[in-house]
């Protein structure tokens, strides 16, 4: 695997190997007074974010530093992009500066693929490119950490019924999770108003429903999504209040879930809209576990791309 741009870059076997690798990194760090492994010593990892981020950017930076990499954060607002430099020139500059890995978030779908194409393969000195979210396309490492969290909470993903609820249309998280969870044997159902479903969703490996209340009793997990108002230029639903009434996860709706079911959210959460504060803070919600798993999962991805399928270094 040269890059991680899409869930399509993975097979079921390689996805499970990454989940296992993440848990090995978690174990390797347990009990260490200094959370450092020498695995990526001498490697240069650059995070290049053209959109705001807290969880993804920070967890990639922590992952790189815990593996002893030199981590450099390239902010679009303080780079030559703000002066009109093209994405290609920026990417080639970072390659020339010695990046071993480029972790890219960009508002345009396909941006990470283009950067990987421009900068070349590792075989000819190019960096590994990791898609940290490209427009409404994909966010593969988020799906991987969500799958890891589900596996830890549910024991196995095979045969589980998992709902992805909310703004499917604008969500790269929904796309990556639908592909990965289906690959791992889950039954995935998308729950959203018709206006927030993408064209062509019938080709996805999922079923579609419009009533959240009807789905909750039969679920093993529910992944709540934020309404991405910043990507909307029209009326996709009458009001925030009506959206919350129909698709928000309230305490009453939480009680409809089976006792073992778990609630996930990729963040940031809009409390009071897609999820009630009491639900967000419930022990049945795995939001902080997702963040913790995000660090270990991204350690695994960096390791696989830059080192290969070897044992975790001491």
Swiss-Prot record:
Looking up SUPFAM superfamilies in the UniProt record yields: Aspartate/ornithine carbamoyltransferase
EC number of this enzyme: 2.1.3.2
What does it catalyze? carbamoyl phosphate + L-aspartate = N-carbamoyl-L-aspartate + phosphate + H(+)
Pathway named in the protein's UniProt entry: Pyrimidine metabolism; UMP biosynthesis via de novo pathway; (S)-dihydroorotate from bicarbonate: step 2/3
UniProt entry keywords in alphabetical sequence: Pyrimidine biosynthesis, Transferase
Q: What's the stated role of this polypeptide? A: Catalyzes the condensation of carbamoyl phosphate and aspartate to form carbamoyl aspartate and inorganic phosphate, the committed step in the de novo pyrimidine nucleotide biosynthesis pathway.
The family database entries (NCBIfam families) matched by this protein are listed as:
asp_carb_tr, PRK00856.1
Q: Which family is it part of?
A: Belongs to the aspartate/ornithine carbamoyltransferase superfamily. ATCase family.
HAMAP family, alphabetically? Asp_carb_tr
On subunit structure and binding partners, the annotation says: Heterododecamer (2C3:3R2) of six catalytic PyrB chains organized as two trimers (C3), and six regulatory PyrI chains organized as three dimers (R2).
Name the record gives this protein: Aspartate carbamoyltransferase catalytic subunit
Q: Per UniProt, what is the name of the gene that codes for the protein in this document?
A: pyrB
């Amino acid at each position: 695997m040269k890059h991680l741009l899409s869930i399509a870059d993975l097979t079921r076997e390689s996805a499970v190997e990454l989940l296992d690798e993440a848990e090995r990194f978690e174990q390797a760090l347990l009990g260490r007074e200094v959370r450092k492994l020498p695995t990526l010593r001498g490697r240069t990892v650059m995070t290049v974010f053209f959109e705001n981020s807290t969880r993804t950017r920070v967890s990639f930076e922590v992952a790189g530093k815990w593996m002893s990499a030199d981590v450099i954060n390239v902010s679009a607002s303080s780079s030559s992009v703000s002066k009109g430099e093209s994405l290609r020139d920026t990417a080639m500059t970072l390659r020339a500066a010695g990046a071993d890995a480029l972790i890219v978030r960009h508002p345009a779908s396909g941006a990470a693929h283009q950067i990987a194409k421009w900068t070349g393969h590792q075989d000819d000195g190019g960096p590994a490119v990791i898609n940290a979210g490209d427009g409404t396309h994909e966010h593969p490492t988020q799906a991987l950490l969500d799958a890891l969290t589900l596996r830890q909470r549910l024991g196995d993903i095979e045969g589980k019924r998992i709902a992805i609820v909310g703004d499917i249309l604008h969500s790269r998280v929904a796309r990556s999770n639908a592909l990965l969870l289906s690959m791992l044997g889950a039954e995935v159902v998308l729950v959203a108003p018709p206006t927030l479903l993408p064209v062509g969703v019938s080709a996805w490996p999922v079923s579609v429903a419009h009533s959240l209340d009807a789905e909750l009793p039969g679920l093993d997990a529910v992944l709540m999504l934020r309404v991405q108002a910043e990507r909307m230029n029209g009326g996709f639903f009458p009001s925030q209040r009506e959206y919350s009434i129909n698709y928000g996860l309230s305490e009453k709706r939480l009680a409809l879930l089976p006792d073992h079911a778990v609630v996930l959210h990729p963040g940031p959460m809009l409390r009071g809209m897609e999820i009630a504060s009491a639900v967000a803070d419930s022990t049945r919600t795995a939001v902080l576990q997702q963040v913790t798993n995000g660090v270990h999962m991204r350690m695994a991805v960096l390791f696989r791309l830059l080192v290969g399928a070897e044992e975790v270094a001491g």
